[in-house]
Amino acid sequence: MLTSSTSIGLLTWAVSRHGYHWVVTTPRERTEEIERQVLSPRASLASATKGREREEPHDDLRTVYQRDRDRIVHAKAFRRLKHKTQVFLSPEGDHYRVRLTHTLDVSQIARTAARALRLNEDLAEAIALGHDLGHTPFGHLGEQALTPFLGRPFRPSEQSLRVVDYLENEGAGLNLTWEVRDGIVNHPWSMPPPSTLEAQIVRFADRIAYLNHDVDDALRAGVLSEAELPAGPMKVLGATHSERVNTLVTDLVAASEDQPEVQLTKPVFAALDGLRDFMFEQVYLREDTEGEHERATRLIRELFQYFLDHPKEMPEEYHRAPGDLPTRVADYISGMTDRYALRTYERLFLPRGWLHDQG
């Protein structure tokens, strides 16, 4: 092995019209060559990336998508996902999903499908790990509470892009590749389809993950019973969490093989849609959670108004970010974890211990 202060490489044989000769290749170059030889013609090759907003020297060890993945994992916003609610605002016990465990579920499903389809697993993983970085505290209630202040819908996917572009790394952003950024901002089903098949996989993996683990959490919380689960979708998808995920991932791989887009077969997609409709009716929009939802919404709105009136009390990085004051306040509020938002509200508005006394 040849090493220097700036590069790492191996001597390998190369063939040209002049015969065999030695060349130095880096681990990254060998990975890129393996991608060219092994991956599907429809895969996104790291060596063919559209690049970054700011050009950077190549890394000897990692491809561009591997570097993006690592940057996301080391981001502060990624670490905060462990204290952000997925669905249940006040879960009792340690087994309920939060944004971080959801993100890891999505990543695992996306990697499995990408590998099976000979697509770029590193790209799929990076998009999956970054897709929820912009989510608010208290789940979707947080984004609904922010919308009236902004004069436009607060979209977590757009906020995730803002996080990686402007808010991380002391305002310099993570400078991710075009493909990862496209996959992050276009992962919701309300957006145009992402440009890469890897990002389309993440879009499906997100829905597969959240519907199935939300069913699992609802059963654990006593919100649903096994007997209440919809018979039609359960018959198609399976009776258990693992059966349902296996059915969906296996179907996605079979239906997407050598196709120009990622898809499910019609019966399985219909069953997934049926399960989603059921979850919205029975779990996500349940009337008996309205009091809890109202408290979370009020907390977000009062915090927003406070920092709108006292912007100097926000950390310095939120003053450097581009955008008007409401946008920068939304940056700060949406970046809070559930417990940090509660502590901040308590510190600003309530006698010590009041929130805890309320149960």
Set out the residue ranges of the language-model regions.
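Short active-site segment of divalent metal-dependent hydrolases/proteases
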Residues: 134-135, 209
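Short alpha-helix carrying the canonical HExxH Zn2+-binding catalytic motif
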Residues: 125-130
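Intrinsic disorder/low-complexity segments in short proteins, especially the signal peptide
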Residues: 7, 15-16
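Histidine-centered, transition-metal-coordinating active-site segments
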Residues: 16-103, 107-113, 120-121, 142, ...
